Amino acid sequence: PELHDSVQLIQIPSLGMFETEDRMKLFSLKLLFRPLDLYEWITVMTGGFPEPYTYGKRVYKYLKNNKKDFDIILDNQSLCGSLLKIQDLLPLAVTIHHPITKDHKLEMQNASNWKERLSSMRWHNFLPMQKRVAPKLNKIICVSAPSKEDIVKEFLVEDNKIEVILNGIDINRFVPSPSDSVKANRIITTASADIPLKGLKYLIQALPEILKSFPKTTLTVIGKAPSNSEVSKLISNLDLKEIISFKSGISENEIVDLYHASEIAVIPSLYEGFGFGAGEAMACGVPLIS
């Protein structure tokens, strides 16, 4: 993360299963004597996402041993079971951007076969934990009024436990371009994950029609290039590889430059708790379709 000089980063150790494609090499007989690490390895290898659970276990152990160093804990939607113990240790506020049940439902609706549905169910195996934990939290922060409504509905949280604090855009960084840097016919979009919720496939499906009227159109996607997914297959089938570029692992300043170089921004998301991409585009003075 990009941190201010005054902010200390404390890294909680993990196996780093999502930092490598060769996950088999992370296995060793030592894992047999480290139950949490073994659980993490087995869960990932069988298509699950254990991090909300395993992170919670590890961070609780750290906070229990270093309680005196902290005044308040802010959790960014891990919604791990250990939060219920942490809020007994220290004052705790939890941010929920939106209930991930929304992501899961959209994935199930867009699944084309039983394998994809089974895969989505396995990946989202942390949802029962989140549904159990959320109603028991003392204070929740969410990022928009619609998000609050969905948290109440999906997680059965009492309305008076939730405070709406809108996400902020750094308007000293995301500013209109001071120069004429716009490149004609360039569209920009954001896709922080290759999931149906982001709606990227709908924008890609529209590109052939756009190209009929604006043949020099290009699309810049702020996000990782998908591999072996519906979106990647769609790009290949429509022969759009030459006009679509993906940008990931870049700084906020580089993101601002990309907005400045774009003629229009399109945010095709089916659902967002807040929608940073739309806010950033508007702050940069880029015409927006969302």
Identify the residue ranges that each predicted region occupies.
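Aromatic "clamp/platform" in nucleotide-sugar-dependent glycosyltransferases that forms part
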Residues: 270
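Membrane-proximal helix-turn-helix segments that form the acceptor-binding/catalytic region
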Residues: 61-64, 117-140
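Carbohydrate-associated surface elements
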Residues: 146, 168
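Nucleotide-activated donor-binding/catalytic signature segment of Leloir-type glycosyltransferases, i.e.
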Residues: 229-253
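Conserved donor-binding/catalytic core segment of Leloir-type glycosyltransferases
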Residues: 180-198, 204-207
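A conserved catalytic-core segment of Leloir-type glycosyltransferases
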Residues: 2-58
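Short alpha-helical donor nucleotide-sugar binding micro-motif in glycosyltransferases
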Residues: 249, 257-262
